């Protein structure tokens, strides 16, 4: 198959919005021609320690709950709320819309792929680690 266009955004935790410090914790990728919407999200102990260094009073459970909500929206899980029930492209655009909350997406970027899942994994490795 020929390469198809995709869009992606990096998910960032911004523990104190007023300070602008951020930690990359995931990537959301959409490839419309392949009907693909996927996310890789990871907030392990090392990243939690980094967040606590930025904001000692951070509510880690709240962050984890919000990240789980994003996973559910991507999967179209009915427990993900009304946004999870939208069509794939609409869910992607809701997830990557600018916000001033603790979890923020980067600006949306584009690329070409023959394998959206492999591109998601590659971007995650490069941008989140």
Map each language-model feature to its residues.
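Polybasic/polar functional segments that serve as interface/processing modules
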Residues: 1-129
């Amino acid at each position: 198959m020929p390469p198809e266009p995709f869009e992606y955004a990096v998910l960032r935790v911004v523990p104190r919005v007023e300070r602008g410090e951020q930690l990359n914790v995931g990537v959301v990728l959409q490839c419309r021609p392949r009907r693909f919407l996927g996310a890789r999200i990871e907030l392990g102990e090392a990243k939690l320690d980094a967040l606590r260094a930025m904001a000692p009073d951070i509510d880690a459970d709240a962050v984890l709950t919000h990240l789980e909500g994003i996973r559910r929206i991507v999967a179209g899980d009915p427990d993900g709320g009304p946004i999870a029930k939208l069509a794939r492209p609409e869910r992607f655009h809701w997830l990557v819309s600018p916000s001033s909350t603790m979890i923020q997406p980067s600006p949306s970027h584009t690329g070409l792929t023959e394998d959206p899942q492999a591109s998601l994994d590659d971007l995650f490795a490069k941008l989140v680690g």
